[in-house]
A protein has these predicted regions:
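Transmembrane signal-anchor hairpin modules in multi-pass inner-membrane enzymes, especially those
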Residues: 1-88, 96-101, 111-135, 188-200, ...
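Flexible juxtamembrane loops connecting transmembrane helices in multi-pass membrane enzymes
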Residues: 163-164, 227-228, 247, 263-301, ...
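TM-adjacent membrane-interface loops and short helices in multi-pass inner/ER membrane proteins
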Residues: 290, 295-338, 345, 352-359
């Protein structure tokens, strides 16, 4: 049994490995009926933190020095300062409830880091233990990815990288959860001498890289590049400063051989099944032609704009997802919001100001500094320095993730980050302690334990409420997304607790509840909930669209239009917002409002918006309004193959009276045509085209009739209007012109026209083409 220096039973030595394994395995906690598995994972983290706290309280006399050791370095002080500053954001946050949820999470991560540091201080062979634990976890994650790939191939014959989730919620989390563990496997390869272990561990590296090649997260490819460069630098330095042995340089094979083999297998076996890693890697660039990169750059610009305007106090921790809607409002489709800025660092700057950004960045900078000091000045063994350097490489992988994604919101990757930071801190403090004993500050122990207790107990309450909410949101969001009302009305108020007050997609929960009361026509109850919903998220305007619906159902069209206008101008790219506002403009015959909405309505050139605008405008503007005609013409240029747009253009440019009159002339012309009176048919068809010069059918009919009576020049003039100006792309007009050319004695000139007509799908052209052009 483990004993301390006094010969007494040491419970920390016994329990430290168990608790550390518990932390590191948090990523395996499943959804447990929640919308997102992070909810039960945060609960799990809180519970393990509380278990650690109970042990620390029971062993408080033995850990006095350790607590001083882990809480007094600048890294820890910066981290504590960051949490304190984040806590203050509760008082100025857009949504203080959401700030509270996120403050609770960050307090848990802080205590997890400090707890890990205390546990690692009391753990022998910590480097081996952590590396073996993470290697085993990595093997399980790889297995899950390979199972996904095999199932996809067996089911569909291809691999769908976007669906390669493994044991996590999405492929980016899976990819970085795998990549960040590779340095620990490389350390074991360096450490162990048995060839069988080296082969086993090298195989794990190969399978990890092969998994990443199938997942195809480009950011993880950059992470792999950092690992390769870092490991190469390590082996080169060891070669220069230590052995000068070729064997040292050959150690590069432990990363290069698996890498080349993974690429080869990917290209030979997997690329043809939808997961070509080389082609995917080739798309890594800063080009704005890439949709994903363009989106991230837009998010970064919004964040930096906000920081420049709010350098001290931001939106409040966890509140950028709300303010981002305001910045990105013209590009948001539906209610899919930019939930994260895809860079933890600058997002924290937007949420907590420059001070919060610098405090968080300081944690990383101090970690890098500690590694440099340890490697440069420590008298530790090459084995320990190798491990610490590889910790820095792993931290670099996390930093790439943190600059391109949002690992700060995901416990699965955060636990590894906390372990890395804790290990760096412990090794640095051990180095300092070797030169000069670290002074124990007895007062820190009761302060630390008391603050931990005061923070963690409420944290359990809040994280559990969030978990219960995410279970209830499963039902609310299923109904919301399918526009159904399966949840009974008597369960609506109790299906989720009051924390948080927005869904995982930022829709106010009270507003989602209100839709059930709107459906039940309990309007007063619904309006009260919607007022609360607006306060929870004032930028999404879902509450306003429901208020508009309520007032319209009550016959209060002006009030309905006021709220529909707010919703439309708030999120103009939302089809529900635009269609409701246009409908109310039409009902109230408000031409001024339609004119005001035009620019935003057509900004993205969406077919339905243009069509709805033209339909409503045609009833509000006078016939042949010049401005409206120009807009209708522009619509035909944007959507040249859409018959509804063409019909609306004709109706607007000619007027309904003109369209009807032309149709009447055309009908008379067809009557003459059917009895072979082509002269009178031509007269009626020409009346039709003069009345409605935008309908190509009138020109085609007139040209055909004139062709049949031998009026070839006029027929050619009329059919040229169709080809050159109206361009219906139906093949018929080219066929008619070809017949005119043949009758004029120019069959050679007719052949290109017949070729075009045949290829456009006009079947009558085939026989004529074969007769004259073969």
């Amino acid at each position: 049994m483990a004993k301390n220096q006094s010969g007494k039973f040491d419970i920390l030595q016994l329990l430290s490995p168990i608790i550390l394994i518990g932390y590191l395995c948090l990523g395996f906690v499943p959804n447990l009926q929640a919308v997102d598995k992070i909810a039960p994972q945060w609960v799990g983290m809180t519970l393990i933190n509380l278990v650690s706290l109970i042990i620390f309280i029971s062993q408080r006399k033995l850990i006095k020095q350790t607590i001083s050791k882990v809480t007094t370095p600048y890294l820890s002080l910066f981290y504590l300062g960051f949490i304190f500053w984040a806590g203050l954001s509760y008082f100025y946050a857009i949504n203080s409830t959401e700030a509270l949820v996120n403050i609770t999470r960050q307090v848990n991560v802080l205590f997890m880091f400090l707890s890990m540091a205390v546990l690692l201080c009391n753990l022998n062979n910590k480097a081996r233990f952590i590396s073996w634990t993470l290697s085993i976890i990595l093997s399980i994650e790889i297995y899950a990815v390979l199972v996904d790939a095999i199932e996809m191939i067996n089911t569909n014959g291809i691999i769908v990288p976007n669906s390669m989730k493994g044991v996590t919620a999405n492929r980016n989390i899976t990819a970085f959860s795998i990549a960040i563990k590779i340095p620990f496997v490389l350390y074991l390869i360096e450490l162990l001498k048995k060839k069988s272990f080296k082969v086993l561990l090298t195989t794990i590296v190969f399978l990890a890289l092969l998994s990443l090649s199938m997942i195809q997260s480009r950011a993880s490819f950059i992470g792999v590049g950092l690992i390769v460069v870092g490991y190469s630098i390590l082996q080169t330095v060891i070669y220069i400063k230590q052995s000068r042995s070729k064997k040292t340089l050959l150690s590069l094979g432990y990363i290069l051989l698996p890498l080349f083999l993974a690429i080869a297998v990917n290209q030979i076996v997997i690329a043809g099944k939808g997961a070509d890693a080389v082609s995917r890697a080739a798309t890594i660039s800063l080009s704005t032609n890439d949709g994903s990169i363009n989106q991230r750059l837009r998010y970064y610009t919004d964040v930096l704009t906000h920081i420049s305007s709010n350098p001290i106090f931001g939106t409040g921790l966890g509140n950028w997802k709300l303010k981002s809607i305001d910045y990105d409002s013209k590009d948001i489709k539906g209610y899919v919001v930019p939930y994260h800025a895809h860079s933890d660092f600058i997002q924290l700057g937007a949420e907590l100001g420059i001070i919060g950004f610098l405090l968080y960045l300081g944690i990383f900078l101090w970690a890098v500094y500690y590694v440099f000091i340890y490697i440069r000045h420590s008298k530790s063994s090459i084995e320990e320095k190798t491990f610490v350097f590889l910790l820095l490489v792993a931290l670099g992988v996390y930093s790439i993730d943190a600059n391109l994604n949002f690992p700060i919101a995901r416990p699965q990757v955060l636990v590894v980050w906390a372990a890395i930071i804790a290990l760096i801190l412990i090794y640095y403090q051990n180095h300092k302690q070797a030169d000069k004993p670290i002074k124990t500050k007895p007062f820190l122990t009761p302060v630390f334990l008391s603050l931990a207790f005061v923070c963690l107990v409420p944290s359990l309450y809040i994280t559990n409420k969030v978990y219960k909410s995410l279970k209830g949101q499963m039902f609310l969001l299923q109904d919301f997304n399918s526009n159904k009302f399966n949840l009974p009305l008597n369960q609506v108020d109790t299906v989720v607790p009051d924390i948080p007050n927005i869904t995982v997609t930022t829709i106010p929960i009270n507003s989602v509840k209100a839709r059930y009361y709107v459906n039940a026509k309990q309007y007063d109850k619904a309006l009260a909930l919607l007022d609360k919903g607006t306060k929870a998220n004032p930028y999404l305007f879902y509450s306003e669209i429901l208020k508009s619906q309520i007032f319209q159902e009550q016959g209060k069209l002006d009030s309905a239009k006021v709220y529909a206008r707010k919703a439309f101008f708030g999120l103009p790219n939302n089809d529900l917002h635009s269609s409701r506002y246009l409908n109310l403009i039409n009902l109230t015959r408000d031409r001024k409002a339609l004119e005001e909405a035009f620019t935003l309505l057509t900004d993205k050139n969406k077919l339905n918006n243009w069509k709805n605008y033209l339909i409503i405008a045609s009833g509000l503007y006078p016939p042949k309004d010049k401005n409206l005609v120009e807009r209708a013409k522009r619509a035909t240029e944007l959507f040249p193959s859409n018959e509804e747009i063409k019909a609306l253009y004709r109706q607007i440019a000619v007027g309904q009276v003109g369209v009807n009159a032309a149709a009447s002339f055309s009908a008379k012309g067809l009557d003459y045509f059917n009895v072979q009176d082509y002269t009178n048919a031509a007269i009626e068809f020409e009346k039709a085209l003069e009345t409605n010069p935008l309908d190509y059918a009138h020109f085609e009919n007139a040209a055909t009739a004139n062709y049949l009576i031998g009026n070839l020049e006029k027929a050619l003039e009329q059919i040229n209007v169709v080809i050159e100006e109206l361009n219906p792309l139906n093949g018929k007009c080219e066929y008619i012109k070809a017949l005119i050319f043949i009758r004029m004695g120019d069959p050679v000139g007719a052949c290109p026209l017949l070729f075009t007509s045949r290829d456009s799908g006009y079947s009558q052209a085939t026989a004529t083409f074969d007769q004259y052009c073969r």
